[in-house]
């Protein structure tokens, strides 16, 4: 049986305070994300030919899946992927400015880090309804985009490096309707070491 797992966080639920409150984080990870994982496993249970597929393989090839499970995999697989990356790129010791190779590439494509912050913040804040704001590697270029619902940049052939979740369950208990305030404060949690590592891995994968 296909058995995707809810990832363990590298920090406790209260360690992203005050930017993300422990109540929100515990529900977001332990309830919302867990539901996506459980639903994805249930969807794939009877499709043994898919049990050896990675999450990325499933999401990059939705058009090859049996039609009756495409929507469920898109939503639940996407939910699992988006949340897993969201947790990875945050840290109690986050914030500050980018470092390593990704810092140089950000300066090249956005001129300054502040320009990236402005563009990604606007993409996240202006996303109508639920979705995500992303920094992605598109070929050799960095760009900003947003996606609705649980859609991922993988479906457009782009490699995600950084993501912010702007579904209401990501912030509503603390920020209510103040999405811009949540987005501003989220920058204090960004784990730039992890983003740089994602960038290096993405560049390496394109060479194979």
Swiss-Prot record:
Binds 1 Mn(2+) ion per subunit. The keyword Oxidoreductase applies. It catalyses: 2 superoxide + 2 H(+) = H2O2 + O2. GO terms for biological process: removal of superoxide radicals. Mn(2+) binds at residues 28, 83, 165, 169. Pfam families: Sod_Fe_C (PF02777), Sod_Fe_N (PF00081). Its EC number is 1.15.1.1. One of its GO terms (molecular function) is superoxide dismutase activity. It is an enzyme of class 1 (oxidoreductase). Its cofactor is Mn(2+). Keywords: Manganese, Metal-binding, Oxidoreductase. One of its GO terms (cellular component) is cytoplasm. Belongs to the iron/manganese superoxide dismutase family. Homodimer. PANTHER family: 37S RIBOSOMAL PROTEIN S26, MITOCHONDRIAL (PTHR43595), SMALL RIBOSOMAL SUBUNIT PROTEIN MS42 (PTHR43595:SF2). Destroys superoxide anion radicals which are normally produced within the cells and which are toxic to biological systems. This is Superoxide dismutase [Mn] 2.
